[in-house]
Every structure is written in structure tokens, then in C-alpha cells.
Amino acid sequence: MRVLGIETSCDETGIAVYDDEKGLLSHALYSQVKLHADYGGVVPELASRDHVRKIIPLIRQALKEANCTQDDIDAIAYTKGPGLVGALLVGACVGRSLAFAWGKPAVGVHHMEGHLLAPMLEEDVPEFPFLALLVSGGHSMMVAVEGIGRYQVLGESVDDAAGEAFDKTAKLMGLDYPGGPRLAKLAAQGEPNCYRFPRPMTDRPGLDFSFSGLKTFAANTIADEPDDEQTRANIARAFEEAVVDTLAIKCKRALKQTGYNRLVIAGGVSANSRLRESLAEMMQGLGGRVYYPRGEFCTDNGAMIAYAGMQRLKADQLEPLAVKGMPRWPLDSLPPV
């Protein structure tokens, strides 16, 4: 089976062609970072319009790079949600239209299931069951994964997601958009133990996250301290360490609760090197293993949508003809495969 994957949930237009025997045949991505930089964040209307401009050229590019035509495509998978409703509708409309015109089946994919399954694109893949930490700009959640579609959300953010906290704190520090990677780069220049930030919700039972208070703590620290480069780097490091420690503490707690010894990290924040190092060290100490996608598949992309969609298509979980985007869509509401 050969699937065309379409991702348009936020500010990246991602197109990919995935073959169940040959693997990933092509992967085309356009990022809107420059478009939104002047606004310090994603502007939904601008994001939707840019998806409209870029999606067809990227589909042509992906098909060309995969050395195939529409006749070689067996099915189409597109991101149905969650995400920005206008952006979702662009991908859904194009995906459904191509499916109708080409006479192919189509399926709407859950964006976070795409992230969760992104490590399956690598050569070394995790076996079920495993614990998944999904951390991005819009979501932070801990999921027990027994199989595809067999998900139990153990904890999630009650306010700001981890990636959102990174971006907002970076903005408070005067860093350009996208703030998360820039804050991490600044933190690498910081000295340890200069500031002690709280580790939110780690002093109580449960696996939920809260990062809004940490962001406020960072804002107060920034306001009270000198505005020189080294001080800013030290604050950035303290903030990053607090987020990473919080995530690691929650992961360790969840692993003990589930009895699993395999951990998957996915989503945009999974590209953070300090987080990867911390969780790898933790899992080594626990006698387990950690898995994550390569850097280009940490952020939104069409490859993960093509792969996740293929699993649904093989189970004959097809979509009706109606075009629908779902800005809110609980991960654990998905049917098993």
C-alpha cells in the first residue's frame, strides 16, 4: 500500500509518500516561521492562507521525489485534528477532493497519534506496550500505549503546554519567534545553579502538568534581574532545567505506575537536547530504553500522518465523504486497530 500524507494542523505544510514495503519515499515540508515571526506567534488566518498557496506545489514535489503519479497512490491520509480549524480545513478539503477525483479511499488522522507513532518511521522501533510522552506547543500528555488506538491518557497539561511555556518565556526574554529553540540555544550558554525554579505539580500525586506558574516565575525573575546576556542565559538554563526535570519526574512516576520499561518521546519539544539527555540517562538507570523520532520528524510533518493513516486504512477505518476538521479531539477516543 502507498499512502499520500497531508499535514496542515498549524504552521507547517507537510506532504509525504509512504509505502508499506519500501518505507518513506518522499517528504516535503514548508514552514511558515518567517511569515509569523513579525507577530511573535502563529496568526491562524495567515496560516490558513499560506497552506492554500503551498499545498498543491508540495504535493506535486512529493509525488515527483517519490517517482510516482496519482495512479501509484492507493490512499490519502490527512490531519483531521486537533489544530487550528482553518488550517485543518485546507488539508481536509484538498485530501478529500483528491481522493474523490482520483477514486481513492481517504482517512482523517489524529495529529497527536501521528506524533506518537513517528518513532515507527525509524529503523529501531519500540515494541508495544510503551509509555509515550507527547510534548509540543499545543499539547503535553502522558499516554499508556498498548497498541495502535489502544491509548490511555494518564496525565496532561491543565494550562500551558510545555512548548507553549518555552515560547512564551522566550518572548518575555525578547527572543525571536520561534522562541523554544532559541531559548534552548541561549540556555546552553548558561551556568548551572544560578537560579532555582520550581518543579510544578511534582510534590503531589498524579501525572498532570502545569507550566503557567513556571512561566510567571520566569517573568518575575527576568523583571528583577539585570538585563545582560549572561544573566539571561542563566535564567534560560534554570527555566529549561525546571521543565526537563518536571517531565522526567512525571515519566519516572508513570513508568512505575504502568510497569513499562520503554519510553517514547515525541512532539516538537522532543527535539530538545537537554530533555533527550535527561530521559536517556533516567531510562538507562531504570534498565529501560527511550525512543524518539529523528529531528525532522519531531516537528509537524506529512510522514507521520501518512504512516498513522496507513495503519487506519489497513483496518478499513475509512472516512465518509463529508469534509470535517476537529480542532478538539481526545486521543483516547480513537478506535483500536
Swiss-Prot record:
The keyword Transferase applies. InterPro entries: ATPase_NBD, Gcp-like_dom, KAE1/TsaD, Peptidase_M22_CS, TsaD. PROSITE patterns: GLYCOPROTEASE (PS01016). Substrate binds at residues 134-138, 167, 180, 272. GO terms for molecular function: iron ion binding; N(6)-L-threonylcarbamoyladenine synthase activity. Binds 1 Fe(2+) ion per subunit. Keywords: Acyltransferase, Cytoplasm, Iron, Metal-binding, Transferase, tRNA processing. Required for the formation of a threonylcarbamoyl group on adenosine at position 37 (t(6)A37) in tRNAs that read codons beginning with adenine. Is involved in the transfer of the threonylcarbamoyl moiety of threonylcarbamoyl-AMP (TC-AMP) to the N6 group of A37, together with TsaE and TsaB. TsaD likely plays a direct catalytic role in this reaction. It comes from the Bacteria. Belongs to the KAE1 / TsaD family. It holds the Pfam family TsaD. Fe cation binds at residues 111, 115, 300. This is tRNA N6-adenosine threonylcarbamoyltransferase. It catalyses: L-threonylcarbamoyladenylate + adenosine(37) in tRNA = N(6)-L-threonylcarbamoyladenosine(37) in tRNA + AMP + H(+). It is found in: Cytoplasm. Its EC number is 2.3.1.234. SUPFAM superfamilies: Actin-like ATPase domain.
